[in-house]
Amino acid sequence: MSTHGYDISAYQRGISFDILKNSARFLILRGGYTTNGGRRKRCTDQYFNTFYNEAKKYNIPVGVYYYSCAQNYQEGKEDAVYLYNNVLKGRQFEYPIYIDVEDQWMLKAGRTGCTNAVHGFCQYLESKGYYTGFYAGYYVLYNQMFPEPLQRYTWWCPWWNKSTTPPKKIATLPNMHIWQHSGGGCHVAGYDIDGDYSYVDFPSIIKKAGLNGYEKV
């Protein structure tokens, strides 16, 4: 069984949730990002609050991702601290909280740096009671990070094609729980947005365990 949803950010500002609710079974919202280059700065997505409130209004389950430029454990942790203080705290989420590993500045850190950045991000948020994971392409995970230590976290994997089933290369991997099947290929409410399939009942798991702002059932 799979559940179909989307991931959106300020780039989709103005999208109608009254239309989006008809096909979105979950949403992963960009909570924040780090600007790359020499003057890196952590920022909150300008439309996160609007999108979060709209999703809650229409009872659409929500997760969050942070677009990172972290190059080591400490910087990954600092991303998580920023996200917790400015986005997560005081809110409830039905899907995991992800660190997005794709920026070239981040990838310059090499396999050890990128892997440790994921650990820093995820371990801090786990200590705060969140279900955590990472977004990374198959090539990035297996050639620019160390995949084995990261199997403890849920993996959101982009691999774009027109099929409704994930490629065999990733379908059998134990922690690949969300597949991003389209990068801007879903036309919804006048916007071209990313489409995702989830293969895990995250809302039930998270609520039962009392994670992501929920009290344990």
Label the model's feature ranges.
Residues Y67, Y135-G137, H181:
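Conserved beta-strand termini and adjacent loop/short-helix elements that scaffold enzyme active sites
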Residues L125-N143:
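Aromatic-lined carbohydrate-recognition surfaces of secreted/lumenal glycan-active proteins
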Residues T34, Q104, Y139-L141, K162, ...:
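Short, solvent-exposed loop/turn segments at secondary-structure junctions
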Residues Y82-I99, D103, Q144-N175:
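Structural recognition of alpha->loop->beta junctions
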Residues M1-Q12, F17, L150-V217:
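Functionally critical loop-and-helix segments that line ligand-binding/catalytic clefts
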Residues M1-Y131:
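Substrate-binding cleft of extracellular glycoside hydrolase catalytic domains
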Residues L20, D45, G137-Y138, F146-P147, ...:
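Alpha-helix initiation/capping motif
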Residues G113-N116, G120, F134-Y135, F146-R152, ...:
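Basic/polar, cationic surfaces and motifs that engage anionic cell-wall
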